[in-house]
Amino acid sequence: MSQSYINVIGAGLAGSEAAYQIAKRGIPVKLYEMRGVKATPQHKTTHFAELVCSNSFRGDSLTNAVGLLKEELRRLDSIIMRAGEAHRVPAGGAMAVDREGYAKAVTAELEAHPLVEIIREEVTDIPSDAITVIATGPLTSDSLAEKIHALNGGAGFYFYDAAAPIVDKSTINMDRVYLKSRYDKGEAAYLNCPMTKEEFMAFHEALTTAEEAPLNAFEKEKYFEGCMPIEVMAKRGIKTMLYGPMKPVGLEYPDDYKGPRDGDFKTPYAVVQLRQDNAAGSLYNIVGFQTHLKWGEQKRVFQMIPGLEHAEFVRYGVMHRNSYMDSPKLLTQGFQSRANHRLFFAGQMTGVEGYVESAASGLVAGINAARLFKEEEPLVFPNTTAIGSLPYYITHADSKHFQPMNVNFGIIKELDGPRIRDKKERYEAIAKRALADLAAYLTV
């Protein structure tokens, strides 16, 4: 093919992963990132692969679909997984990272790579000079989004998601919280803020009546279930919170807890969990408390949480609009455009939802862009694997009802033979098959 490089637009998780996979295969990359010359509403730094919502890569067990996907990515030499592993922070059975250390590591490795040229500028049109991976994310600039939407017949999709507040640990009242992971799984990694029924009811009332930051009048409120604002969840009813981010099961009071409780109950009525957000352990985020409340309201309402009475918020929660494509119509399983075979898309804009899923899409798109450059057939991972099932799902879903999707065992091809009734055993069997099939596919 008569060209000497591949473009990658956007240095988020997907773009960073794509650029690395291309360069690893000996092909020069021009990696474009506008942060540094033009800010986005949500990013705080100019580092690559910045985490703008939670600092968690979610479950790490192979009986969890995202845990399986992470293991597959490790075996495929993912730069995102490698940097994440190097900057882990305690999170029980989950994988969480020091967001700044991790992002700096990804940035440094790509900046130092001899085949990666970093170009800090905004791209406003779809390049025609070379094979291109577009990974501009859900916060794609308006000018480029218009060009991408033109591929979609002008019909763009969107949803809103939000980020949770972060507090300074030194301002937490440690007499009202206790360190524990749910069911004592893994190390004790979460600060737990227990509530009595009276405290919970007062908190719920304050949350459901608090003032939200306004949306544009012409935009409907449309949320992705996995990142729903806590106030929207609260308005669905008390049980939604008690069976969701504030569920108390597995978080019994420690024997030495001296705070208020309901009678002799060993388990609180509700619990708010705080998760370590940086390696130093000086910052904690409020787990599951993505929010779109006005900042003053966040301070008022969230200081009702036991232990946070005088907490200082180093970052308030924010909400932003995310755009995504009609992937069932527009993309192949290799994340290649059906309309322009020299064009690939990756990341949340394709309808994959989550950090790990975005990295996975970037890995697949990057590998396939490199294979096109070398005039090789694209890789289509088997849908018995997590990394194969995700692109299969987003390219085979019903276009009329297509919405972003996290990886889960429900989208991975079922096992052959009689159904294994025990869920843990079934998931273990799916994971074992996935890793075996991935290894076999890569040796063909």
UniProtKB/Swiss-Prot annotation:
Required cofactor names: FAD
Keyword Transferase attributed: yes
Keyword NAD tagged: yes
Entry-linked SUPFAM superfamilies: FAD/NAD(P)-binding domain
Superkingdom per UniProt: Bacteria
InterPro entries on file: FAD/NAD-bd_sf, MnmG-rel, MnmG-rel_CS, MnmG_N, TrmFO
Subcellular location: Cytoplasm
Listed GO biological process terms: tRNA methylation; tRNA wobble uridine modification
GO terms under cellular component: cytosol
EC identifiers of the protein: 2.1.1.74
Catalyzed reaction equations: uridine(54) in tRNA + (6R)-5,10-methylene-5,6,7,8-tetrahydrofolate + NADH + H(+) = 5-methyluridine(54) in tRNA + (6S)-5,6,7,8-tetrahydrofolate + NAD(+); uridine(54) in tRNA + (6R)-5,10-methylene-5,6,7,8-tetrahydrofolate + NADPH + H(+) = 5-methyluridine(54) in tRNA + (6S)-5,6,7,8-tetrahydrofolate + NADP(+)
Main localization, broad class: cytoplasm
Pfam families in the record: GIDA
Binding site for FAD: G10, A11, G12, L13, A14, G15
Top EC class of this enzyme: transferase
GO molecular function, one term: tRNA (uracil(54)-C5)-methyltransferase activity, 5,10-methylenetetrahydrofolate-dependent
Function comment: Catalyzes the folate-dependent formation of 5-methyl-uridine at position 54 (M-5-U54) in all tRNAs.
Family the UniProt entry places it in: Belongs to the MnmG family. TrmFO subfamily.
UniProt protein name: Methylenetetrahydrofolate--tRNA-(uracil-5-)-methyltransferase TrmFO
Gene responsible for this protein: trmFO
